[in-house]
Amino acid sequence: MKKLTIFMAILLMVISIPSFAQDKTEKPKEAIKPALLVIDIQNAFLPRMSPDKEIAMEYINALIDLFRKNGYPVIRIYHTSEEYGVKPGTEGFEYPETVKILPTDPKVMKTYADGFNKTDLDRVIKATGSNTLFLCGLSAVGCVLATWIGAQNSDYKAFMVKNAIISHNAEYTKNVEQMFDAVTYDMVQLIIENSGK
């Protein structure tokens, strides 16, 4: 019986060696190619946001500066809605003049919370060559969250940026930042400045 046990142990080891060897094979890591998604910081929606929106706007502008300085795309996303009267060409549709976007930044318009749903956002991102997305804007509990999920479903690495997302309730925003592991500005800066462009 002892010989049979030893034989079975040796046989099990021999059989499992190829599977262990296969598990050790490393896939080459894809280089980080970041893009910033600035979501829905439109004049019609900002008055409904919590008072921490002023701090968030500072972070959003700092992120725009960081991405632009390092040659990475800033993609602006706009929500259009008949219900809320947010139509292209109206003041409510536009971003505040204090936001450092440029007319040359790619622009995507959406009618659903998820920026990927029935839009050309995926095509726009692919055209920039980006594979890693950093999200800022509003609402943390609405369009930012839905677009983060859409990015995950579209096989992008996606991160919300802490203090650069806002909602109508600051506590809800903090909960989203915690639940979805929002990254800090300093972490984004570290990634951007070391991503090899």
Regions found by a protein language model. Give the residues of each.
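Active-site loop/turn elements of alpha/beta-hydrolase fold enzymes
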Residues: 41, 79-80, 163
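Bacterial N-terminal signal peptides
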Residues: 8-16
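Positively charged n-region of N-terminal signal peptides that target proteins for export
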Residues: 1-4
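Short acidic, Gly/Ser-rich segments with clustered Asp/Glu that frequently serve as metal-coordination loops
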Residues: 42-48
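…and closely analogous acidic/polar surface helices at protein-protein or active-site interfaces
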Residues: 49-67
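Von Willebrand factor
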Residues: 66-83
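Active-site-adjacent betaalpha module
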Residues: 21-28, 32-35, 62-65, 87-197
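Short, solvent-exposed loop/turn segments at secondary-structure boundaries
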Residues: 48-52, 86-89
